[in-house]
Amino acid sequence: MSDMIQRAAEVPFELGGQRLDQIAAQLFPEHSRSRLAGWIKDGRLTVDGAVLRPRDIVHSGAQLVLEAEQEAQGEWLAQDIELEIVYEDEHILVIDKPAGLVVHPAAGHQDGTLLNALLYHVPDIANVPRAGIVHRLDKDTTGLMVVAKTLEAHTKLVAQLQARSVSRIYEAIVIGVITSGGTIDAPIGRHGVQRQKMAVVDAGKVAVSHYRVLERFRAHTHTRVKLETGRTHQIRVHMSHIGYPLVGDPVYGGRFRIPPVASQTLVQTLREFPRQALHARFLELDHPATGVRMKWESPLPEDFLWLLSLLRQDREAFVG
């Protein structure tokens, strides 16, 4: 049985004067733009009680009311894919995602994804938008993700993400030696030419990352990055933008760099590192049902630890 969606929101000043479909996407981000547009056309999403078109301009102060039935995501297969679950109750589950697992079906990845696994593990999650997925990790990024098991939990988690009260802290190994930490406040949007890539662009969405140095090596740095926003590829784009791309990043990696007179093992490991060296290490949020602040930590994966050990050996051999 499908759940009923009942949401209401007032258009804030900063969104006034935009198209209805654009405003709806900002106020109800847990639903896809195409789904929202369909509800607008069907009269399920009204403005001050009136049915408008998606392209109609709406001013600040207007009341948006959404009353619709959440359709089950029956087009996706439930698949028995092993998940490393670090926490689960009737409202949420937290997983430790391995490298290579795509989060959501897309072109080229119609099955074998986290969404397919969730539909098998929690069948009722089919009634939750996007099978409860409220934030994503790239295919080859490892670490912690929270998933909502109910519509109420989904709504509250999305609200926390919008309010930037969910703490997401990552660790990365980057190319280059960073002298000190800092903040990157640079908007992110689609690359002007390579549409599959993201880039720092003036017309992009606000994106803020805070980074600090954990350990320096001869030509690399182990960093910790805290997200204030959660844009697509944010850490990868931001670190590359300031000149410190992630080791192993096939898209934003930039120039390959090897410390002078490095061991063959280190050289080979750096050349063949199979993914971007990025791990979602810490996750902290308010439980959507109890309000209790909860925190989880994921240990660094083996490939990450192996590279760190080789970089330490290289530094010590050089200093010695």
UniProtKB/Swiss-Prot annotation:
UniProt subcellular location: Cytoplasm
Provide a GO biological process annotation: enzyme-directed rRNA pseudouridine synthesis
Cellular component GO terms, alphabetical: cytoplasm
Reactions accelerated catalytically: uridine(1911/1915/1917) in 23S rRNA = pseudouridine(1911/1915/1917) in 23S rRNA
Record bears the keyword Glycoprotein? no
Task: State if Cytoplasm is listed as a keyword.
Answer: yes
* Enzyme class, UniProt record, top EC level: isomerase
Q: Which keywords fit this entry according to its UniProt record?
A: Cytoplasm, Isomerase, RNA-binding, rRNA processing
Cross-referenced Pfam families: PseudoU_synth_2, S4
Q: Where is the active site?
A: D138
* Residues of the S4 RNA-binding domain: 18-90
The molecular function GO annotations come to:
23S rRNA pseudouridine(1911/1915/1917) synthase activity; pseudouridine synthase activity; RNA binding
Stated EC number for the protein is: 5.4.99.23
The primary site where this protein sits is: cytoplasm
Q: Which PROSITE patterns match?
A: PSI_RLU, S4
What is its biological role?
Responsible for synthesis of pseudouridine from uracil at positions 1911, 1915 and 1917 in 23S ribosomal RNA.
Q: Which family does it belong to?
A: Belongs to the pseudouridine synthase RluA family.
Q: What is this protein called?
A: Ribosomal large subunit pseudouridine synthase D
**Species, as recorded:** Pseudomonas aeruginosa (strain ATCC 15692 / DSM 22644 / CIP 104116 / JCM 14847 / LMG 12228 / 1C / PRS 101 / PAO1)
Q: Which gene encodes it?
A: rluD
